[in-house]
């Protein structure tokens, strides 16, 4: 068992144990946590889907591909909410970033296609991207690379 494998199992176990000690009336409706990969997300999102919505945290800004791939993988494995504050407000254009995120989910395009569309949108708005397209297409988050 790898360290990462041990961590997500421990983390999910602690979340469930904490929730077990809370009465149904006081239990949260929404749970947010870091994305720890497919198995971790599937397990925690299926804990009590009728009463608890699972969402992921965005973490650091990273590349646009990191953002869109995280969103794609998290949704695929059960997350239903994404709290991506920094990934949105630190992007070149918040509206264009949200548009790219919606395209990836609603139009079922790949994170690569989403990054290209995001750069096209920035170009149309006359906004210079922080990274050239080649660099923004890089997937820098290890947890996301493993699950492609």
Question: Predicted regions span which residues?
Answer:
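Alpha/beta enzyme core
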Residues: 1-54, 65-80
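Intrinsic-disorder/low-complexity, polar/charged segments
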Residues: 11-12, 63, 93, 111
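C-terminal helical cap(s) of enzyme catalytic domains, especially alpha/beta-barrels
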Residues: 75-77, 89-147
């Amino acid at each position: 068992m790898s360290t990462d494998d041990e961590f997500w199992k421990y983390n999910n176990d602690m979340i469930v144990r904490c929730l077990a000690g809370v009465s149904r009336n006081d239990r949260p409706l929404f749970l947010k946590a870091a994305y720890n990969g497919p198995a971790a997300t599937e397990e925690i999102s299926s804990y009590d889907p009728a009463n608890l919505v699972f969402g992921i945290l965005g973490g650091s800004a990273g590349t646009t591909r990191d953002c869109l791939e995280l969103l794609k993988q998290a949704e695929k494995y059960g997350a239903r909410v994404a709290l991506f504050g920094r990934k949105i407000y630190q992007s070149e254009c918040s509206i264009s970033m949200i548009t790219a995120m919606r395209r990836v989910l609603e139009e079922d395009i790949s994170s690569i296609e989403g990054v290209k569309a995001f750069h096209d949108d920035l170009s149309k708005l006359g906004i210079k991207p922080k990274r050239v397209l080649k660099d923004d297409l890089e997937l820098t988050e290890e947890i996301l690379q493993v699950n492609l």
